Amino acid sequence: MNVSPNRWEFLLQSLRDLDNSLVQLGSRLFVIKGRPVDILPSLFKEWDITRLSFEPDCEPDCKARDMVITNLAQQAGIEVINRVSHTLYDPETLLMSAGGRVPLQIDAFKELVLLQGRPEMPVATVDRKQFGSCTTPVGEDHKKRFGVPTLEEIVLHKPLTVSSRFYGGGEREALLRLEKALQQVNGLAYCLERNT
C-alpha cells in the first residue's frame, strides 16, 4: 500500500489514542497484523467469538474483503453487525438516493442530505457498564502480538520524515482542535458584533 508517512503516523496516533481509551475501560485494542481472511478464522476459535462488528467500507476492494470475512464469520456461527459511524449519513444510502451518481457540487449534496432528514443522535459514550461481562484476553505477549505498531515497523522501505505541519491523530486531538476552532469562531462572532 502506497501511503505517506504523515498519513500512517496520523492513523497510528489514532490507534494509540483508542488503545489508551480502552485501557481506561479495562480493555485493550487488538491490532491484528496480516490478511484478515487468513488470521480471523483462527482467532474466532481461539477467543470463542460470538459477535463480530465492524464499520463497512465503501471502497470496492474493501467491500469484497468485508464480504469474505462476513461469510467466514457466519459459517463459524458468529453474528455479524455492520454500523456506519464515521459519517453522519450512510454513503451508500446517499449514493442510492442520488440514483448512483455522486453529487459533484455542494448544493446538490446539500439537497441530497436534506432529503434524508436529520441524522441519528449520537450514542452515549462507552463506559465500563456497557462492557458488562465481556472479557478481554490480554496476554503477556499482547504488545508483541497485538500492540499498535510503530511507524518504523510499517514503513520499512521509505524515509521516515513526518511533516512539522502534521495534524495529530486520535479522538482527544480532534476534540482539542474542534474546541480551538469553536473558540476562534466565537471570538470572530464577538468581534463582528462589536463592529456593527
PLM regions with names:
Residues M1-R128:
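Trp/Phe/Arg-rich N-terminal binding region typifying the photolyase-homology
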